[in-house]
């Protein structure tokens, strides 16, 4: 590390100048990789480990990081600190070796908190919408010339990265409640998009515990900070009297401080008016579909308005918003073989949503923008515990599509739970009599099993948080045409 780099480090986090080499266990995850990318650009020596290469590790390698595709004790040699993902178990060889060598082992959010410590932090939390809202806030600040640093849980498509080092005082970050580690953060502004029961193993199955944790997160704001909260959400409305900080509310509700009105969706764009107290109305064209994205935009506008950002910059950023990876991600429209003598096409959309509320929002956006298309969903449930806990909600939401193909549950390290598997979920949906789901036990057969379902005027939603995104990209590569010998590597 040269003198110029050290000077830059001192100007950002003065006491972290003692740190030279930062090692990340699980560096290929979007959240971990984003922080590693910012630190690499700040001049730190970065290394990390994961099980396989991916776009995140490729980007980090291009920045000079050393990536190991294994977990071995020697990987942490000479590290000043080890940053660990919540997905990594305590008996990981690198974690054990770090403890034995008396190297500090910290969670991802603790490192993010250090990045935020000497900046104007804007943290975006909530069960749904965090990634997109983070990208919207970042886009507005960038359009206004404020050059923010951002760390996001998904790819910000306009920038082509999950994270970017800016040169201003602003740091915009997604705040993760899944392991309660967002309590490490001490932002100046916090957005809470909504609060629902998810990741309940972290909260010992106690929803009151989850709600109190969000309150504790908001109490990390200084008394002169601001909480921006969606008043449409019944849990947030219930918690507002307990926040104890300055608040700005947003939503479709008439009592919202920033109110969405006259929403209309035309294809992939939303058109609506934002009413702000004491400010001119904003007539917004948002390049993202769905009422849920109008709410995300309202949150971003509330923050930008409080900062004094020019309305023209806000409107330009939202109209040109390119979205985030795997959030209603349009992968193409492909010609199909003629059906009943008529040629047709199918649109392919990839979406990360894996909670019933998220899936419902995606379906509604698809119906609103393309009402005449047959809606075909390829769904992969994520985690047996989530499938068990939200079983009826999944069954209710998934019956809204015209045709459903379902992959096996993506376990994310969990053991199977009887009755919380895809076969059982398909049976429950079938018994309701609205649609007849197709169980796809072999991912390599997706294109073959999808073909007879298509009519030539279709919108295919590939939905889920596991490896189903790889299948979506594979379907795009082969233009939805079944291959004679479909490769299994995409599954």
Curated annotation (Swiss-Prot):
Main localization of the protein?
Answer: cytoplasm
> Which reactions are catalysed by this chain?
UDP-N-acetyl-alpha-D-muramate + L-alanine + ATP = UDP-N-acetyl-alpha-D-muramoyl-L-alanine + ADP + phosphate + H(+)
Q: Tell me a GO biological process for this protein.
A: peptidoglycan biosynthetic process
Q: Which GO terms describe its cellular component?
A: cytoplasm
Q: Which UniProt keywords apply?
A: ATP-binding, Cell cycle, Cell division, Cell shape, Cell wall biogenesis/degradation, Cytoplasm, Ligase, Nucleotide-binding, Peptidoglycan synthesis
Q: Name one GO molecular function term.
A: ATP binding
Its pathway, per UniProt, is:
Cell wall biogenesis; peptidoglycan biosynthesis
The positions annotated for binding ATP are 126-132
**Enzyme nomenclature, EC number:** 6.3.2.8
General function of this protein: Cell wall formation.
Q: What is this protein called?
A: UDP-N-acetylmuramate--L-alanine ligase
Q: What species is this protein from? A: Salmonella paratyphi C (strain RKS4594)
Record lineage: Bacteria, Pseudomonadati, Pseudomonadota, Gammaproteobacteria, Enterobacterales
Provide the gene name from the record: murC
């Amino acid at each position: 590390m040269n003198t110029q780099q050290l000077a830059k480090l001192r100007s950002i986090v003065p006491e972290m100048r003692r740190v030279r080499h930062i090692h990340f266990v699980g560096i290929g995850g979007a959240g971990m990789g984003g922080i590693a990318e910012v630190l690499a650009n700040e001049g730190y020596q970065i290394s990390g480990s994961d099980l396989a290469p991916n776009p995140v590790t490729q980007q980090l390698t291009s920045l000079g990081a050393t990536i190991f595709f294994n977990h071995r004790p020697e990987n942490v040699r000479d590290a000043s600190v080890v940053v660990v993902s919540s997905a990594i178990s305590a008996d990981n060889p690198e974690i054990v070796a770090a403890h034995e060598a008396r190297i500090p082992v910290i969670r991802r959010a603790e490192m993010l908190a250090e990045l935020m410590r000497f900046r104007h932090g804007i943290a975006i939390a909530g069960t749904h919408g965090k990634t997109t809202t983070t990208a919207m806030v970042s886009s507005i600040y960038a359009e206004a010339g404020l050059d923010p640093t951002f760390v996001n849980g998904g790819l910000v498509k306009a920038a082509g990265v999950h994270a970017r080092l800016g040169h201003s005082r602003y740091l915009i970050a997604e705040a993760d409640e899944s392991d309660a580690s967002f309590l490490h953060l001490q932002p100046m502004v916090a957005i809470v998009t909504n609060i629902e029961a998810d990741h309940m193993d972290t909260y010992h199955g106690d929803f009151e515990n989850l709600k109190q944790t969000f309150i504790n997160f908001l109490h990390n704001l200084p008394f002169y900070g601001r909480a921006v909260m969606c008043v449409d959400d019944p849990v947030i409305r219930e918690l507002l009297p307990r926040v104890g900080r300055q608040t700005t509310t947003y939503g479709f509700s008439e009592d919202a401080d920033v109110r969405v009105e006259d929403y209309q969706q035309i294809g992939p764009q939303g058109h609506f008016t934002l009413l702000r107290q004491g400010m001119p109305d904003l007539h917004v064209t948002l390049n993202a579909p769905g009422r849920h994205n109008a709410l995300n935009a309202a949150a971003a506008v509330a923050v930008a308005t409080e900062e004094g950002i020019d309305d023209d910059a806000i409107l330009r950023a939202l109209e040109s918003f390119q979205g985030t990876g795997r959030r209603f991600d349009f992968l193409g429209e492909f010609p199909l073989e003629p059906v009943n003598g008529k040629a047709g096409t199918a649109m392919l959309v990839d979406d990360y949503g894996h909670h019933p509320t998220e899936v419902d929002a995606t379906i509604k956006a698809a119906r609103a923008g393309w009402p005449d298309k047959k809606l075909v969903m390829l769904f992969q449930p994520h985690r047996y515990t989530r499938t068990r806990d939200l079983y009826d909600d999944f069954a209710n939401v998934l019956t809204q599509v015209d045709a459903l193909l379902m992959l096996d549950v993506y376990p994310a390290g969990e053991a199977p739970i009887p009755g919380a598997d895809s076969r059982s979920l398909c049976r429950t949906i079938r018994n309701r009599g609205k649609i007849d789901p197709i169980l796809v036990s072999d991912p390599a057969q997706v294109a073959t099993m999808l073909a007879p379902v298509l009519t030539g005027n279709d919108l295919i939603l590939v939905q889920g948080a596991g490896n189903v995104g790889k299948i979506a990209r594979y379907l795009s590569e082969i233009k939805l045409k079944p291959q004679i010998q479909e490769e299994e590597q995409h599954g």
